Amino acid sequence: MNQMMTFLQTNGGELLYKTGEHLYISLIAVVLGIIVAVPLGVALTRMKKGAGAVIGFVNIVQTLPSLAILAFFIPLLGVGKVPAIVALFFYSVLPILRNTYTGIKGVNKNLLESGKGIGMTGWEQIRLVEIPLAIPIIMAGIRTSTIYLIGWATLASFIGGGGLGDYIFIGLNLYQPEYIIGGAVPVTILAIIIDYVLAVTERKVTPKGLQGMKEVS
């Protein structure tokens, strides 16, 4: 307990900075994942062939060890936040892509035909019919991806990306439990807070009649 108090007194200000840094790395990667995965998921629903291959490839990338992905980008991008964010971006794509694809494919075809009947263009059907109906599943994928990345972002310190992982690695290398706790506990709290915020957001953007839908696993 004394060691933990000493750690907090010594590193209190830096701990807040590291927490913000950790959140920044995670959220930038998730935002990039959303920008890529949602349009790609919609596009795949328009493909008669190839959708399974694309999702299968992303699945393979997801199974690669996190440290291997981080190490892969060192020769290409060096060390620091950029390679860490790029590596985390790759991990963010699968849950969002899979849920977007599944959510859009699950939209009732009769509704799409009705949209065509009143003169909707393809883009209008996506924007006004398909995305709103698929939003519970899409948001569930975003939520899953974000929580995963907050945990995986601890590995960013392996390549100089910063964040709360710095404390965990220092604690492991120097056998100082207070540093491990000082990094791990804020990560856990951060994940819980972000999960709650995203859960509230999910309820706000989901039409009331669709709020019973669950994430596709």
From Swiss-Prot:
Please provide, in alphabetical order, the Gene Ontology terms of the cellular component aspect for this entry.
plasma membrane
User: Sorted alphabetically, which keywords does the UniProt record give?
Assistant: Amino-acid transport, Cell membrane, Membrane, Transmembrane, Transmembrane helix, Transport
Q: What induces it?
A: Repressed by OpcR.
Q: Does the keyword RNA-binding apply?
A: no
What is the annotated localization of this protein?
A: Cell membrane
Q: Name one Pfam family in it.
A: BPD_transp_1
Topology of the protein relative to the lipid bilayer: Multi-pass membrane protein
Q: TM segments?
A: 23-43, 52-74, 84-101, 128-148, 150-170, 180-200
- Gene3D superfamilies assigned to the protein according to its UniProt record, in alphabetical order: MetI-like
> What is the superkingdom listed in this entry's lineage?
Bacteria
Ranges for domain ABC transmembrane type-1 come to 19-198
- Which GO BP terms apply? amino acid transport; glycine betaine transport; transmembrane transport
What's its job? Involved in a high affinity multicomponent binding-protein-dependent transport system for glycine betaine, carnitine and choline; probably responsible for the translocation of the substrate across the membrane.
Q: Which PANTHER family match?
A: CHOLINE TRANSPORT SYSTEM PERMEASE PROTEIN OPUBB, GLYCINE BETAINE/L-PROLINE TRANSPORT SYSTEM PERMEASE PROTEIN PROW
Q: What family does this chain come from, according to its entry?
A: Belongs to the binding-protein-dependent transport system permease family. CysTW subfamily.
Record note on quaternary structure: The complex is composed of two ATP-binding proteins (OpuCA), two transmembrane proteins (OpuCB and OpuCD) and a solute-binding protein (OpuCC).
- The protein, known as: Glycine betaine/carnitine/choline transport system permease protein OpuCB
Gene encoding this chain? Answer: opuCB
